[in-house]
Regions:
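Short, small-residue-biased leader/transition segments that mark boundaries at the very start
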Residues: 1-8
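Alpha-helix C-terminal capping/helix-to-coil transition sites in glycosyltransferase folds
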Residues: 3, 34-35, 78
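Short internal beta-strands
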Residues: 6, 64-67, 231-234
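Thiamine diphosphate
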Residues: 17, 21-23, 30, 74-84, ...
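Phosphate/diphosphate-binding loops
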Residues: 22-73, 259
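Structural motif
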Residues: 38, 151, 202-204
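Flexible, glycine/charged-enriched surface loops at secondary-structure junctions
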Residues: 100-114, 299
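Active-site diphosphate/adenylate-binding microenvironment
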Residues: 114-189
Length: 327
């Protein structure tokens, strides 16, 4: 059971949830995609960020594809069984025909990958040895401070991947993201909308310095509407996702990715929005508590490691079982 973008409710804690598929997803689900005998895809478009090299993707598996749009069937990956319709109806109908089964050996096969990923990626990200804040530890700290009950909104880039990996949920309908569409600037207006749609819940949006500046004027909307958006800026002074590719595949030839940033504290003040900048983990918890306790909008600028990377990563053109754990 793996989920590229549908991650809400108690799915993050369910014992059969083995993590996230995709280029920056979890190690086990990606590797075992090329080992499973049956692959059930629900509302999935089999985009290249999930499949990696198509010629080697799940060739051993019988693929069952649930979707409401017939154009998605066989578009990228050949389907053995197609089930068309609203998934609320089709899944309910199919599950009535199933008998309980226990595939413990298959479930246990994920453990070795979980242990490797924990050691090589997750622990260093959430508990870094260096002085600089990591993106992952900021995301997890906000998640825990909101008791995993907040609505998560993401922009695009490394902030999106880190949010998907380390933010947890205890309620349904808890994530708003543009998936693989690459819509930098999406986060801020989407978060404003979420506060109107669910005024009873805390809305946290994670953004990078590149994405925030693409829709910075929406701070005016927040000021005017008094939208209680909790904005977390992961500021690394780079267009981080592109910089990571330039570092890994182009010998660190950084072209148009270093950012010259304004003073976000002064900008927030100009919009009459409370704000705080943190540069050390000793400051982080107190600043997050202040953000959550503030009645209204708040901008938390976390100055994170400038050249942090999102791992694991399936290299461009590589197979899903060739994930890299380090640069």
């Amino acid at each position: 059971h793996s989920f590229p973008t549908r991650r809400s409710s108690d799915l993050t804690n369910h014992p059969l949830n083995k993590g996230m598929l995709g280029m920056h997803g979890n190690l086990g689900p990606n590797i075992n995609t090329n080992k499973c005998d049956v692959l059930i895809a629900v509302g999935m478009r089999f985009d290249d960020r999930v499949t990696g090299k198509l010629e080697t993707y799940a060739k051993q598996a019988k693929i069952i594809h649930f979707d409401i749009d017939p154009a998605e069937i066989d578009k990228n990956v050949k389907t053995d069984v197609a089930v068309l319709g609203d998934c609320k109806e089709t899944l309910a109908a199919v599950t009535q025909l199933l008998e309980p089964a226990n595939h413990q050996e298959w479930i246990d096969s994920f453990r070795q990958y979980e242990e490797v990923e924990e050691e090589k990626v997750i622990r260093p990200e959430l508990h870094p040895a260096g002085k600089a804040l990591s993106m992952g530890e900021v995301v997890r700290a906000v998640s825990e401070a909101t008791h995993n009950e907040a609505i998560l909104v993401t922009d695009v880039g490394q902030n999106q991947m880190m949010s998907a990996r380390y933010f947890k949920y205890s309620k349904e309908r808890s994530i708003v993201t543009s998936g693989g569409l690459g819509t930098m600037g999406f986060g801020l207006p989407a978060a404003i909308g979420a506060t109107f749609g669910r005024p009873d819940r805390t809305v946290c949006v994670f953004m990078g310095d590149g994405g925030l500046q693409m829709n910075l004027q929406e701070l005016g909307t927040i000021m005017e509407q008094k939208a209680p958006v909790k904005m977390i800026l992961l500021n690394n002074n780079f267009l981080g996702n592109v910089r990571q590719w330039q570092a890994m595949f182009f010998n660190r030839r950084y072209s148009f990715t270093p950012m010259m940033n304004p003073d976000y504290m002064k900008i927030a003040s100009a919009y009459d929005i409370p704000a705080r900048r943190v540069m050390t983990r000793e400051e982080l918890a107190k600043a997050i508590d202040e953000m959550i306790a503030t009645d209204g909008p708040f901008l938390l600028e976390a100055c994170v490691e400038e050249e942090g990377n999102v791992m694991p990563m399936t290299p461009p053109g590589g197979s899903v079982n060739q994930m890299l754990l380090e640069c």
